[in-house]
């Protein structure tokens, strides 16, 4: 794989990279995962990094972008097997498709392509936690005080900040755990409809809700930002530029 570390061993690892979002808050005609960042599309930053540590990469993108991504990836000199599949209307449905496409592995790393500034240390910590606990979800402590408020803006409570974490990706799970979680979720959707699934915002929530497994967090990074607004693109350019200068 071309990368030597404590996480690089006989464990078979596959990555599911989610690049199917519309990115409406970016206010651009092009979806955020295809915007130019340091000379390449946003999603390609994650593909290149996970290629150093994954045996297989499943890129989940919008149906109309599958061919574009395939053509782009064919020009890349990647070590991992890479497949591109069409995603769905909801993130968790796209993630479920990605997990289904992953096979014959010990660990599945699920990552949002919009987090183009993720670094190898964050990925390795996620893997290390998953090997021990079955899950490793990148997270960082809150820096700010958080308030719970009603629709009128009246404060209802102030949670203890020390117990709260901002959740990121990658989210790494043992293959059997994440597959069982999504199988259970899929059964509920097929029998009761998609509304019965509730509001699912990440893969850890699927494991929390649809299995009896405990979810464990791993140390993320404040640089591992999610590209959501134009300001985030500026910040990401600064982060990646600084790393380039350090090399």
Which residue stretches match the model-derived regions?
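Residues at the starts of beta-strands that form the adenosine-phosphate
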Residues: 55-57, 134-135, 214
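Short, flexible, basic/aromatic active-site loop/helix in glycosyltransferases
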Residues: 148-173
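N-terminal glycine-rich phosphate-binding loop and ensuing alpha1 helix
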Residues: 12-66
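Single conserved hydrophobic/aromatic residue that forms the stacking wall/gate
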Residues: 1-11
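Conserved N-terminal catalytic core of the sugar/cofactor nucleotidyltransferase
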Residues: 8, 43-105, 186-191, 195
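Conserved alpha/beta core of the MobA/IspD/sugar-nucleotide pyrophosphorylase nucleotidyltransferase superfamily
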Residues: 165-247
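Residue-level signal for inorganic ion chemistry
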Residues: 17, 43, 98, 111-112, ...
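Conserved beta-loop-beta/alpha segment of the NTase-like Rossmann-fold superfamily
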Residues: 89-149, 168
